[in-house]
Design a protein with these regions (language model features):
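The feature captures the beta-strand-to-loop junction immediately N-terminal to the Walker
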Residues: 33-35
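Helix-to-loop junction immediately C-terminal to a conserved catalytic motif
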Residues: 48
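Conserved ABC transporter NBD signature motif
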Residues: 56-64, 73
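Conserved ABC ATPase "signature" region
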Residues: 97, 113-131
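Catalytic Walker B motif of ABC-type/P-loop ATPase nucleotide-binding domains
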Residues: 160-164
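ABC ATPase nucleotide-binding domains
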Residues: 237-270
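Alpha/propeptide regions of enzymes that mature by internal proteolysis
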Residues: 262-486
Length: 486
């Protein structure tokens, strides 16, 4: 275990690191974050003893590092420095072998089996055996970086201090290196402190993070306690947005540009929709921020093409994703820029309406096939046939994440109310239907103009969505019923 208490130090009269305290238990990895010049490397130098501290303590398992001899300390602690000016005249194997120096004794050091095994293991872990006899200066920056990490690993110390270990590495080698280091920490009970410039990598791999600001600890804790928008923005002086990692409970940030997106003169208009026998199509000049439960590109994203495609009643293709992607490509659209839904009802039965407001307008488009309507409170009791109400809400305005979700809720409530009003029943239970079995909803916004933080019924936007979806759904049901009667 490594314990740092009130560590203070710097260069000459210049105090860089000011009263830093923390502990890292065995088997854990602490990531150091902070902007350029905040004192990260200086702190590492103080911890490793390369730079004497002005005050404070660094203890390894309860013993101050000042009590260790140089070789004894090197057996406990391996350091990957930020710059590797040394050793460029050596081969890869020779460079990695230098990591074994604390384990050599006497003037005529004897190279043991243990030394050989440690070097071989380090070469293997960093996947650099193939360069074993290559002079280091003939390797790429990323390959060299792996050699220096191998040198630190060959030292077989229980504490690893790494200054930007992923420097120069491509994304796969970043992952491989950090996976290896993390695995080593767990399997060999290593204590690891590592400096990171990449906040997202640090969040993904570290158990604890320390955010350094002008030599002070601004925040320390688990990644979710440290990777917070306001703190990161203040310390790094950059606009960021925080979002969840898709697979791990580790927050990630996205850098936001200082330069604004050029404003588009065009807005979403109902008359710009086109309706053919194949599809209802809306093509936007600018990408719209979209949240949907579509077939293609469901979830959140930015898209310019919106398709509600007509398919036969008996459309039943196992891989509808591939089939729909092909359909989009064959029509000259880009699947990466398109949200696509399907409906069995005729596209001419779509209802598209524009609702003006004080902030801009909302365009709503609904197709409603209610032959297989469902009372959702009884859905679990029996199998369901396919049926679809597709609801699109396109907003000329800038929605918050909250507003996107509220818009979905408001739209769903309005749809259900319309079914109730029209007396649409679940054919299997005879009770009032709440929707159909495969309804889709889409909310998209220009993200320009008025900022719309909410979209519940209490807001103007929510009110428009509520009455708009209600009206459109009622009219769409009427068209559907009329067509069925004929
Ligand atoms: N050898 C030195 N002598 C005098 N001042 C130094 C020395 N090394 C670093 N400094 C100063 O100490 C401050 C902190 O530097 P340090 O290298 O610790 O920052 P850092 O957080 O690691 O930055 P970076 O992200 O750029 O690597 C800087 O203002 C730097 O100019």
């Amino acid at each position: 275990m490594l314990k740092i208490t009130e560590l203070t130090g710097g260069y000459g009269d210049k105090t860089i690191v000011k009263g830093v305290s923390f502990e890292v238990p065995k088997g854990k990895m602490l990531g150091i974050l902070g902007p350029n010049g905040s004192g990260k490397s200086t702190m590492m130098k103080l911890i490793s003893g390369v730079l004497p501290a002005k005050s404070g303590m660094v203890e390894i398992e309860g013993r101050a590092i000042s009590e260790f001899g140089a070789k004894e300390l090197a057996k406990k602690m391996a350091v990957l420095p930020q710059l590797h000016a040394h050793a460029f005249a050596h081969t890869v194997r020779e460079t990695v072998s230098l990591g074994r120096y604390p384990h050599q004794s006497g003037w005529f050091a004897s190279w043991s089996h243990e030394d050989e095994a440690a070097v071989a293991e380090a070469l293997r872990l960093m996947d650099i055996q193939q360069y074993e006899h290559t002079p280091i200066d003939q390797l790429s920056g990323g390959e060299q970086q792996r050699v220096f990490v191998a040198q630190a690993l060959a030292q077989n110390a229980k504490i690893l201090l790494l200054d930007e270990p992923t420097n120069h590495l491509d994304i796969n080698h970043q992952r491989e290196l950090l996976d290896t280091i993390k695995r080593q920490a767990i399997e060999k009970d290593l204590t690891i402190i590592s400096i990171f410039h990449d906040i997202n990598l640090a969040s993904m791999y570290c158990d604890q993070l320390l955010l350094l600001d002008k030599g002070h600890v601004m925040r320390i804790g688990e990644p979710h306690e440290v990777v917070r928008e306001q703190d990161i923005e203040r310390v790094y002086q950059a606009r960021v947005s925080n979002h969840p990692h898709p697979e791990l409970p580790k927050p990630q940030i996205t850098l936001l540009p200082g330069v604004e997106r050029p404003r588009s003169a065009s807005a979403i208009r109902a008359e710009d929709f086109s309706i053919s026998a194949e599809m209802v199509l809306y093509e936007s000049d600018v990408p719209l921020k979209t949240v949907s439960s579509a077939v293609i590109n469901a979830g959140a994203g930015w898209y310019r093409t919106f398709i509600n495609r007509h398919v036969d009643m008996d459309y039943n293709i196992d891989d509808s994703l591939s089939e729909m992607t092909r359909f989009i490509e064959e029509r000259g659209f880009k699947p990466t820029d398109t949200v696509g839904m399907m409906t069995a009802i005729k596209t001419e039965h779509v209802i598209i309406k524009e609702f003006p407001s004080s902030f801009g307008s909302v365009v709503i488009a609904v197709t409603a096939g209610v032959g297989n309507a469902v009372d959702v409170s009884k859905a679990i009791e029996r199998p369901l046939g396919v049926g679809t109400i597709n609801t699109w809400i396109l907003v000329n305005g800038a929605l918050s994440d909250e507003a996107f979700i509220q818009a979905m809720i408001t739209a769903t409530e309005a749809k259900t109310k319309a079914l109730h009003q029209e007396g649409v029943k679940d054919p299997l239970t005879g009770t009032i239907a709440t929707g159909t079995s495969t309804d889709s909803c889409l909310v998209a916004a220009t993200q320009q103009g008025a900022i719309l933080p909410y979209a519940g019924p209490i807001t103007e936007l929510g009110g428009l969505i509520g009455s708009g979806v209600y009206q459109c759904t009622i009219e769409a049901i009427a068209l559907y019923r009329k067509a069925k009667m004929q």
